[in-house]
Amino acid sequence: MNYREAGVDIEAGRAFVGDIRSLVESTRRPGVLGGLGGFGGFFELPSGYRQPVLVSGTDGVGTKLKIAHQVGRHDSIGIDLVAMCVNDILTAGAEPLYFLDYLATGRLDREQLTAVVQGIAAGCRESGCALLGGETAEMPGFYEAGEYDVAGFAVGIAEKSELLDGSQVQLGDVAIALASSGVHSNGYSLVRKVVANSGLDWTSSQTIFEGQSLGDVFLTPTRLYVKPILAAKAQKIPIHGMAHITGGGLPENLPRCLGPNQTVAIDLESWKWPTVFRWLAKQGNIADSEMFNTFNMGVGLVVIVPAAAETQALKFFKAQGQTAWTLGEVVTGDGTLIGLP
């Protein structure tokens, strides 16, 4: 008996590294030292920082993977993975530098996992960060054949004096929403339950989605906010705080970027729920409060700016191609958002 007969194909693993080498190289940026294949990745910190602080984050894409497996589409999952990590560290005011991935599978399917890495590389290029390395684990008996899981790790850099930790947020500041691209990568256990109970499948198309299949709608990749936020910082738009709206929706995530005894009064009339959320609520008979506590509801990122910079910030983000609007105002409170169902 040998290792391959036990379910682990080392030769296929080597070939896979060759398959993705050019994808990894396509993400190369200043600071990367060496290439793929070492025991660790090397990155030289950029000059020009007085007190550089490294900011790190890790995440996955949850059960959105189940839909990718059922539909057989894997090219967008990597974008989700990068976005979930870099959007998180972005909220601290950090510029993403590099990214690492972990792929675990029951049996190495080179074509399938190359598609995943294509998405990771695309997300890294869009975010200006290098895919510095990763790990691919073949784990027979742990995952079913054809199934895989992914995790990502992002590292960024910020000037210590410019870190966003809630202390800069002031009463009277305004909360500006940047639109999400859809459900992003949270709430998919509920999404899958709604679709299963509806008797539909992922190939079903709905008139409300203009002929798109449910698979296409719910595999829409998570939006990356790195470019517009770094551009805003370069233009000296004063950002006091940011929140990435992920699991737990606005109620869970927006208070994380505020200071003590602060909350946000939300203007529910300031935006209309995107179609995908209206469909989920109706199809699943989901209460409004549950929708807001589970999904982003069309708000992917919230940027807190002083009231005097509201018009400037809105104009700038719209010029960057973002759908942006004033979501609410920072007021006195205990962190419980005001105005939500």
Swiss-Prot record:
One of its GO terms (molecular function) is phosphoribosylformylglycinamidine cyclo-ligase activity. Keywords: ATP-binding, Cytoplasm, Ligase, Nucleotide-binding, Purine biosynthesis. Gene3D superfamilies: PurM-like C-terminal domain, PurM-like, N-terminal domain. Its EC number is 6.3.3.1. GO terms for cellular component: cytosol. It catalyses: 2-formamido-N(1)-(5-O-phospho-beta-D-ribosyl)acetamidine + ATP = 5-amino-1-(5-phospho-beta-D-ribosyl)imidazole + ADP + phosphate + H(+). It holds the Pfam family AIRS. This is Phosphoribosylformylglycinamidine cyclo-ligase. It comes from Synechococcus elongatus (strain ATCC 33912 / PCC 7942 / FACHB-805). The gene is purM.
